[in-house]
Structure formats: C-alpha cells, structure tokens
Amino acid sequence: MPNKKISVLLVDDSAVVRQVLVAILNDTPDIHVMGAATDPIFAMAKLAQEWPDVIVLDVEMPRMDGITFLKKIMSERPTPVVICSSLTQKGAETSLQALSAGAVEIITKPTTGLKNFLIDSAAELVAAVRAAANSNVKNLGKRMAPPVLAPASKLTADAILPAASGHAMAQTTERIVAIGTSTGGTQALEAVLTALPRVCPGMVIVQHMPEKFTASFAERLNGLSQIEVPEARNNDRILPGLALIAPGGKHMMVTRSGASYYVQVIDGPLVNRHRPSVDVLFRSVAKFAGKNATGIIMTGMGDDGARGLKEMLDAGSSTVAQDEASCVVFGMPKEAIKLNAAQRIMPLQEIHQAILHR
C-alpha cells in the first residue's frame, strides 16, 4: 500500500499565488492540496470538514490576519504551519511574529516573475512542507524556565572554503561557540540565548532563513537577551557576550588574525541547498579555531552541518547535538550523530550550559 500523501491547505488572498503554489505542490508525488482558501474565515470553513497535515499561510490578509488565525489554530489543534510571506521588512517582522506563535518554516512568495518562482523556489516550498509534516509541533510552544543565571546541485562547503593552509592555531585564550539550526531553530535559539548571562563566550550562528529576515530576527533576539545579538557584517570581531547571526542569502565563515577571531560574510553558491550553510560555518571554525571552539547542531531538516561538526570534533573542538525529544525536526542532529560527530547529546533546556562550560 502506498504511503499516505501529505495533505496541505493553502490560505492566501492572491488568486495568482494560490494557483502557482497549488501547481507546485500537486505536481509533487507525496503531496496533495486538499483545499485553498482566500482568507482565514474561508479556511476555518474548510477545516470544519477536513483537517490537513500542513497549512501554508499568508500572514497579511483581509478580514483576519494570519497571526490571529495561527494563534487560534495552535490553541485549538496544533498543526504544522509554513508561512508564505512577501520579501519585505514588514513581511519579515510579521513572519517572525508567526514563528514565535508556532509556525515551523518561512518561504518567500513571488513578487515579480511567477515563472522564475516556479523554477527557483519550487524545491524550497516542497522542502518546507515536508519539513513541516515531519515536525514535532508540541515542542514549538515549550519555553525553558528562567535560568538561575533554489534548488541547485547539492554543493558541499568545499565550494566556499579557502584551500587548507595548516592546522588550527591553538595559542589563544579566546573561546568561541558555533551554532547551526534550521526548522524550529528560531524558538530553540530564543530559548538558548535568553538563558545566557551577559558574560559568555562569543558565538557565531547560522539559522536557515530568507534574505532580509535575519536582521529582524537578530533584533528580536537582541531585545530578549542579556547578550548582544546583531546580524553579522563582514569583518566583525567575535567577542565575549556577542552572538553574530549570519545574514540570510550570505555565507558566514570564521577566520583569524593574531589571537582574535573574525567573520567573513560572503556571496557564493548554495551549499547543501542553503545560503547561509551550517557546514560552511562549522568547517571554517574547525580550520581556524580547532580546540578553542564548541560546535552545537540543533533542530532542523536535512544534513547541513553534520560533516562540519565532525570536522570540528576531529580538529579538537567539543561538539553537541540536540536530542530527539526536544527537537521540532530531528534531522540535522540525527545526521551528525550518525557520523559520530557529537560528543554529547543534550536536551534543549541544557544546551546553554554547553556554551558556558566546555
């Protein structure tokens, strides 16, 4: 008997966008669009008849906005939701509110050129729906108690990293922490960073997220945390009490000058179908920081970061993978564990301790 298809409900007030998304999803063998609604009011009528596995939701609609609808869904019957947002500052801020309210993924809707969207973003949409269908939504609403303190060929990070020029340098007192995450990571990072005191090692973080969204994400985390959390800029120095978020649409690598660590924010091809890529970050940390670093891989779909975490371990770094029970999607940590890349497997509520204590 064939596996059951992932049933999807689309909610978007644009008839053209609905048509494009339906065409993409129904052309995918393991996905079926069970309905499409122009706004949340019509969506609720459809939900009264049939409940989908995944909801793809616009956040800016008439009659009832997507955030209000999302909160209603999560309070009544938690369901994986993929946010389909415009690539604007307003769209980014609203989408981050949606992630905080329980959405699991963000995709950007076409602004111009639907043909290009069909070519460039079809795989992104399909991957987001599959990730949502595999997510553990009950972990999205969890919060830790306050602490006592485009489809392209799947390139590896070799396409970005400079050629090897020697072993990682060890004669420095600075310690850095590299974190990589994807689906469910916005909530997980909030839980970890808000548990940290002002005095802690410098951090570099890759969260898979569209361009223009990471600035709003960093600003939000900065307002919630005791530490400083900016979006990274090229040549920023990694300092204690600072967590640099890789910009969407760019790769971020760690480099070193003397006893200090810096980031390089660069263009480049998709790596493991992502930009920024966790592997690009982790493998650069392995090269330039070695035993002075800790690598942490958290909730997310796919295998981005698994190889890089193994390289960090082999270079002398301490390494951590989030455990299955606390992940929204146990994909990236699972692949790292398969490679024997993780020295420790930890629940989300303990990961901040791995940052504070090697």
UniProtKB/Swiss-Prot annotation:
Keyword Phosphoprotein carried by entry: yes
Post-translation changes: Phosphorylated by CheA. Phosphorylation of the N-terminal regulatory domain activates the methylesterase activity.
Reactions catalysed according to its record: [protein]-L-glutamate 5-O-methyl ester + H2O = L-glutamyl-[protein] + methanol + H(+); L-glutaminyl-[protein] + H2O = L-glutamyl-[protein] + NH4(+)
Domain CheB-type methylesterase: 170-358
GO MF annotations in UniProt: phosphorelay response regulator activity; protein-glutamate methylesterase activity; protein-glutamine glutaminase activity
CDD domains per UniProt: CheB_Rec (cd16432), REC_CheB-like (cd17541)
Compartments it resides in: Cytoplasm
Organism domain of life: Bacteria
GO cellular component: a single term: cytoplasm
UniProt key word Cytoplasm: yes
Primary role: Involved in chemotaxis. Part of a chemotaxis signal transduction system that modulates chemotaxis in response to various stimuli. Catalyzes the demethylation of specific methylglutamate residues introduced into the chemoreceptors (methyl-accepting chemotaxis proteins or MCP) by CheR. Also mediates the irreversible deamidation of specific glutamine residues to glutamic acid.
Family label: Belongs to the CheB family.
Protein name, per record: Protein-glutamate methylesterase/protein-glutamine glutaminase 1
Organism: Pseudomonas savastanoi pv. phaseolicola (strain 1448A / Race 6) (Pseudomonas syringae pv. phaseolicola (strain 1448A / Race 6))
